[in-house]
């Protein structure tokens, strides 16, 4: 990130950080399933053919974030996305610069239902200033072979504590715990969040079974201000939701 922000093309750059593992027990939000007739989305279970056709995905959520002059005011991107979304973003970018391409390996259902990530960027707000990030020490290398040896150095330093046993001191009771916090949302809405609706310092509340406006709170977590979306569609981009108060969700 330091190299990109200090580079000559920073003002026209987006840097994606993508992961393929969660590092946790599980995701508390069930991913959408494709319809049975979606081409390329179902296969015969290779380990137990008696189970018949099983979906190849989409899977649980994994960390993914972007750094860009057009993402500087922060937020949580809430659209359904998969690794193919990054390829579709490149397709959109290539079309914009007059060198369009089309990836035939992305099947029609995923192309139609998953985000191309364009809504992750806010083109109405641009901040090209450079943040000073913490310095990261250079990765350890073996002085003789010049090969990276971080794992060996870590094992030598911490001895038997370097490889904790699965599930890394987590318990099943903790598996659905979510870190408390708040951020504005970007993109089309999806399930899996408490939502507050605010504007100009005011928030929508449902106190006493009536909707009204009240002063927003600093942490945006007032119990009477939280709402929950329930997906009612058949495909991710149906954008059909039932909205309820959070107390209906907590029972």
Enumerate the language-model features and the residues they cover.
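Substrate-binding rim/cap in mid-to-C-terminal beta-strand-loop elements of soluble/periplasmic
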Residues: 36-93
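A structural signal for well-ordered alpha-helical segments within the folded catalytic domains
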Residues: 80-88, 92, 111-115, 198-202, ...
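Lectin-like carbohydrate-binding module/patch detector with strong preference for beta-trefoil
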Residues: 160, 164-251
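Sec-exported extracytoplasmic/periplasmic mature domains
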Residues: 2-9, 91-98, 122
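Metal-dependent active-site segment of extracytoplasmic phospho-/sulfohydrolases and closely related
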Residues: 2-42
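Active-site rim elements
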Residues: 1, 5, 48-54, 70-81, ...
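Loop/turn elements at helix/coil->beta-strand transitions in domains of secreted/extracellular proteins
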Residues: 8-15, 22, 60-62, 70-71, ...
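C-terminal "exit" segments of structured domains
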Residues: 107-192
């Amino acid at each position: 990130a330091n190299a990109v922000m200090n580079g000559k093309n920073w003002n026209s750059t987006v840097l994606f950080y993508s992961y393929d593992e969660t590092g946790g027990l599980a995701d508390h939000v069930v991913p959408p399933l494709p319809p049975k007739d979606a081409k390329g989305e179902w296969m015969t279970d290779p380990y137990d053919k008696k189970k018949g056709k099983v979906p190849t995905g989409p899977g649980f959520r994994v960390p993914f974030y972007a750094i860009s002059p057009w993402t500087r005011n922060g937020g949580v991107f809430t659209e359904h996305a998969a690794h193919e979304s990054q390829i579709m973003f490149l397709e959109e970018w290539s079309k914009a610069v007059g060198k369009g391409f089309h990836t035939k390996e992305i099947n029609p259902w995923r192309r139609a239902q998953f985000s191309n990530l364009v809504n992750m960027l806010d083109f109405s707000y641009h901040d090209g200033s450079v943040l000073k990030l913490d310095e990261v020490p250079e990765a350890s290398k073996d002085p003789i072979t010049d090969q990276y040896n971080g794992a060996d150095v870590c094992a030598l330093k911490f001895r038997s504590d370097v490889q904790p046993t699965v599930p890394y001191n987590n318990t099943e009771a903790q598996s659905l715990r979510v870190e408390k916090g708040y951020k504005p949302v970007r993109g089309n809405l999806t399930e899996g969040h408490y939502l507050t609706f605010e504007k100009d310092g005011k928030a929508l509340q449902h106190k006493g079974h009536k909707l009204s406006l009240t002063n927003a709170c600093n942490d945006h977590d007032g119990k009477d201000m939280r709402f929950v979306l329930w997906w009612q569609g058949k495909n991710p981009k149906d954008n059909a939701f039932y909205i309820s108060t959070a107390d209906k969700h907590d029972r």
